[in-house]
């Protein structure tokens, strides 16, 4: 294994500056040390509470400050969440992610959230939540319920952050990650490419993530999904090669983390997605709608996986059932195109 190092922004920028194929070659070499290059981890994402968020994240259609046409919805009933999780499992997903458009969860919501975690775990799936900021007690309660992962993105560099969000600080985000880690929950944290940031900001974001006391187990790299009504709706498109470079640098700097090809994948053709996998991406969202735009249809994903010879990573949880694991490949091949939800995080 490669010994972990503390990264500087200069070192990260030097990786971004490498010739494209040299960078991909290095990323693929690192990837093969830590992972099976033919395996991809698959998650399904469900918005359990949509819209009316009080924050001002300029990229997000869920903010109550922007007119995006998104209808707000109350916290879903536990039974609805479990039904969606069951469908996701039958379609081949091994991790179920539940997200709520909150600045932070309220005390009245915690019993429902804990029950959701317990019942999804009982299906034999890994669990993930993204609920905004957490205090230490909330993190511990979710950990005690069995939560495997908590997502809380840093979004961009500390220097550029204030151009995008003013309603919570960068330190607020780092503090939440600390509380999650202290509670024994695995960390999922990444960022967004295409906010108007410079290459240096992308490098600085990855340095922040890689230099955490322990790097995130999962690092989602999002391409900005431009939604009409948000302040970033007219941003320039991200050059696919710049996005692929970001995936590759993330893989090199965080070799043991799952690097997730996340929001924006619906904008990518097969060739770009294939290059992202070559650069070290080994996790995706599947069979769902991500944010307010659909991911590629499941059948298109399966066609691409077959073309590339990609297999789905099987995950055994403490409550996992062997039959589901044994028939995972068959289940996903036979999956239909049902959309699990029409929601945003």
Swiss-Prot record:
Binding residue positions for [4Fe-4S] cluster: 53, 57, 60
CDD domains linked: Radical_SAM
Disulfide bonds: none
Cofactors required: [4Fe-4S] cluster; [2Fe-2S] cluster
Residues annotated for [2Fe-2S] cluster binding in this entry: 97, 128, 188, 260
Residue ranges annotated for the Radical SAM core domain, each copy included: 38-256
Gene Ontology molecular-function annotations: 2 iron, 2 sulfur cluster binding; 4 iron, 4 sulfur cluster binding; biotin synthase activity; iron ion binding
Gene Ontology BP terms: biotin biosynthetic process
Keyword entries, A-Z: 2Fe-2S, 4Fe-4S, Biotin biosynthesis, Iron, Iron-sulfur, Metal-binding, S-adenosyl-L-methionine, Transferase
Co-factor remark: Binds 1 [4Fe-4S] cluster. The cluster is coordinated with 3 cysteines and an exchangeable S-adenosyl-L-methionine. Binds 1 [2Fe-2S] cluster. The cluster is coordinated with 3 cysteines and 1 arginine.
EC number(s) on file: 2.8.1.6
Pathway: Cofactor biosynthesis; biotin biosynthesis; biotin from 7,8-diaminononanoate: step 2/2
InterPro entries listed in its UniProt record: Aldolase_TIM, BATS_dom, Biotin_synth/BioAB, Biotin_synthase, Elp3/MiaA/NifB-like_rSAM, rSAM
Catalytic activity of the protein: (4R,5S)-dethiobiotin + (sulfur carrier)-SH + 2 reduced [2Fe-2S]-[ferredoxin] + 2 S-adenosyl-L-methionine = (sulfur carrier)-H + biotin + 2 5'-deoxyadenosine + 2 L-methionine + 2 oxidized [2Fe-2S]-[ferredoxin]
Pfam families with a match to the protein in the record: BATS (PF06968), Radical_SAM (PF04055)
Function: Catalyzes the conversion of dethiobiotin (DTB) to biotin by the insertion of a sulfur atom into dethiobiotin via a radical-based mechanism.
Subunit structure: Homodimer.
Family, per entry: Belongs to the radical SAM superfamily. Biotin synthase family.
The name this protein goes by in its record: Biotin synthase
Lineage: Bacteria, Pseudomonadati, Pseudomonadota, Gammaproteobacteria, Enterobacterales
